[in-house]
Amino acid sequence: MNSLKIPDFLIFSTISSVFHSKENLMNTTAKFHLTAAAFGVLIASSVYAETNQVYSNTVQAHNAPMTVIMKDGKIANILTDNRESPGVGKLAIANLSKKIIRNQTINVDNVTGASVTSMALKYAVKKNLEAAGADLSKFQTKLPKAQLKDTYSSEVVIVGGGGAGLAAAASVIEAGGTAIIVEKLGYLGGSTVVSGGGYNAVDPERQNRQNIDDSIDRHFQDTMRGGHNKNNPELVKKLVEEAPPTMHWLEGKGLGFGPKVRVIVGGLYPRGHGAEGGGYGYIRVLEKFIKAYPDKVKVFTDTQAVKLIKNEAGKVIGVLGKHDSKDVNFMASKGVIIATGCYGSNEEMRKAFAPYSLHADAQIYFPTKSNTGDAHIMAMQAGGVMQKNDNHAATVHLEAGAGSYGFLHVNANGERFMNEDVNTQSKSCSKELQPHGIAWTVYDSNWTQDVKKQVDGNLAGGLFYGQMWQPWGNGWNVEIEKASQAQHIKDGKVVVADTL
């Protein structure tokens, strides 16, 4: 089957706004703006009624302006023009809105993995009902749980509904088989859906247009060097050889890649391709393909895989899942594919297998509820063993603080301690060894022009630079970077020389 490797990447920004309405009580149109925050709580300010009503509430959730329309005392529609994470918050809002309208109740379960957005939506609808003078008790009907059978069977059972799991399911379809996807979150996409969507592959057609000389062997050597030659050469060889055809396979499914090639975040050489729609682009095209074959693939969300089922001979023949506290057997006649994420949110496993990762100051990538190492644990319980390395590879970088750029790095004693053009991992690990685990980047008033040269010229050894939210194919925005730096100065992450 084809392989799919997608780096996980997303940083959320914060947007503040309020709710407002200008209609009468029983035919109310209230527009709500859900405020972005890393950790969400619901905060309501004063609500008051006048002839031309205005309701002011603040909800900390994710970016989602929405309009709730009341008609004849009922919820008629919930309109959204939101800036939610594609495939996560947007999907949560769409699914919950349909349930609320269809059943005329706000007593619906949150979408697993999008709890903050789910709570914010229900809170917004509740405030609108109150504003309309509705009897809230009439909108509290508890919906019955969907009942699953004890056993489901297919040729292949896939644990995990992220990018890898959906790619596996699409490959099963193309091979003429049937599959079941078991996903513990309330939506498909996993970490891939909130990733930056960058894809490393040798692609002469695009690279030649930018006079970039590249080869499969060079990609192999760069990847080995990035892993300090601790990588498994056979796996790296397969990765770099399969990357181009898999990229074209995705294009055949409808995924577009921008024409400009650049150094991917943390990379060493300009062979990074940006997927249209970022990480959600992968999920969108793969999910669309799979949905076209409902007789081939069945998807079970909100279903936790808890154990691999083995026969008397010790062969894995299925997966024991749990859905709403009910045990469900998913049997596979031809095999089980484990396609889950990492264990970055499992502190016990990180202590055991990647203790260096515990030194990081922040975790900014994957949804914290998804990457908890469940499948790793299942596999070990079934007799599998973890890779025997001194430390499992963790993506650790400098950007929990201010942007590091490609400038002179010194420690707290003012001493230069490394070659600044090494890869991102080496920079980060070197910084951790310095006094207090802190490094400073030194640059002058021409820094914006210099950073632009780094970005445009694919320089700086794979440093994080430019805007993390910068769409692939768009230029580096000086004004955004200046605004970001102004905030860093306020936060004390950047110090201006003449203020010392």
Place the predicted regions along the sequence by residue.
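Gram-negative bacterial Sec-dependent N-terminal signal peptides
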Residues: 15, 19, 25-48
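Active-site- and interface-proximal helix/loop "cap" or "latch" segments in soluble metabolic
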Residues: 50-143
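Conserved N-terminal/central alpha/beta ligand/cofactor-binding core
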Residues: 107, 111, 178, 187, ...
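A short, basic/flexible loop-to-alpha-helix module at the beginning of a structural domain
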Residues: 138-153, 414
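Beta1/beta-strand and adjacent pyrophosphate-binding region of the FAD-binding site
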Residues: 147-164, 180
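Conserved beta-strand-loop-beta-strand element in the redox core of flavoprotein oxidoreductases
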Residues: 309-330
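Glycine-rich loop(s) and the adjacent beta-strand/alpha-helix scaffold that form part
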Residues: 325-326, 331-397
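An anion/pyrophosphate-binding glycine-rich loop and adjacent beta-alpha core
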Residues: 376, 385-500
